[in-house]
């Protein structure tokens, strides 16, 4: 079980006050999503005018949003020009607990996050020279290699809720099958859509932002808009439907989007029976190995401090690991991973 959460908004359509609230709700969404995964936290920020930024950390989300990188590097990038933000909290199943395996994944034209389990990810043939350790990365690599979504879904057996963007930086895609939840709500005045794995996560994130505004940090009209948003109906994604949100079409009256039905192989039992997995159980996916508490340490090349791996943040845009203490690059070749 993982948490997916984020937003899609029309660029340059918000007031500075609305932008601050969007930042606060984004932070709250990650914190509330911690209940769905504590092994890593990640966020992708997509801007129509520049290259996407992806930040990953082995911190749980409540600690991630307290980090220096969150305050100094991530929050400023959530700007008026931002169009899509993809957030993720991971509970590791396939693949070790490492920054390399943390979401979001950048696979060519695709940046995506996934909640669920793909049972045949080792059978997905995208690159014969590459075996994907994480099922989620295999899915997005498949999406990148084939623009025909139905053909991609025909290859996938498992359960999933997916959030991704393609080359079109102003468009968010959401898709789920019956085994995984996903919900969204639209703030019309700010022309922004928020989404999360559960209705409760969305409600809590918005309610906490309302309380922040009530403490005198905001203005009266923002406070009124937020409570209006809190009372707005939270929508559930229909099963096996692709929702495409083009932020250029967002209005201050209604949410305009497209939806299209697909056929999915979502019943995990079918795949297990078909492949005669008589010994299928949670240990097949390595749950038991993720409860070890001892973390390896590494030396920072700049400040020579011994650092826990969870205190290092990976900046995917710069392909480098950043020391939490001195904020300088650690070692670009380092594969940070929990010792097993």
Question: What are these model-derived regions, one by one?
Answer:
Residues 1-340:
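Conserved short alpha-helical segments that host acidic/polar catalytic motifs at enzyme active sites
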């Amino acid at each position: 079980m993982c948490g997916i959460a984020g937003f899609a908004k029309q660029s340059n359509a918000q007031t500075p006050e609305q932008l601050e609230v969007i930042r606060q709700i984004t932070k709250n969404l990650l914190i509330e999503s911690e209940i769905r995964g504590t092994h890593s936290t990640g966020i992708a920020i997509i801007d129509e005018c520049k290259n996407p930024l992806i930040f990953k950390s082995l911190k749980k989300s409540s600690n991630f949003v307290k980090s220096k990188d969150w305050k100094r590097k991530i929050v400023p990038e959530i700007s008026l020009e931002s169009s899509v933000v993809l957030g993720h909290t991971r509970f590791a199943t396939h693949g070790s607990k490492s920054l390399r395996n943390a979401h979001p994944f950048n696979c060519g034209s695709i940046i995506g996050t996934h909640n669920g389990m793909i049972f045949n990810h080792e059978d997905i043939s995208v690159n014969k020279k590459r075996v994907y350790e994480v099922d989620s990365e295999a899915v997005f690599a498949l999406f990148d290699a084939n623009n025909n979504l139905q053909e991609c879904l025909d290859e996938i057996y498992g359960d999933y809720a997916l959030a991704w963007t393609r080359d079109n930086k102003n468009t968010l895609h959401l898709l789920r099958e019956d085994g995984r939840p996903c919900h969204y709500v639209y703030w019309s005045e700010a022309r922004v859509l928020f989404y999360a794995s559960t209705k409760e996560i969305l409600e809590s994130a918005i309610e906490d932002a309302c309380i922040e505004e009530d403490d005198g940090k905001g203005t009266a009209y923002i406070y009124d808009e937020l409570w209006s948003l809190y009372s707005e109906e939270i929508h559930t994604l229909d099963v096996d439907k692709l929702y495409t949100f083009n932020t250029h079409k967002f209005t201050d009256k209604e949410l305009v989007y497209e939806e299209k039905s697909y056929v999915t192989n979502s019943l995990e039992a079918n795949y297990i029976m078909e492949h005669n997995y008589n010994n299928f159980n949670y240990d097949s996916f390595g749950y038991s190995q993720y409860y070890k508490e001892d973390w390896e340490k590494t030396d920072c090349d700049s400040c020579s401090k011994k650092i826990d791996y969870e205190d290092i943040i990976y900046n995917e845009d710069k392909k480098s690991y950043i020391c939490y203490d001195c904020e300088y690059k650690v070692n670009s070749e380092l594969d940070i991973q929990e010792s097993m």
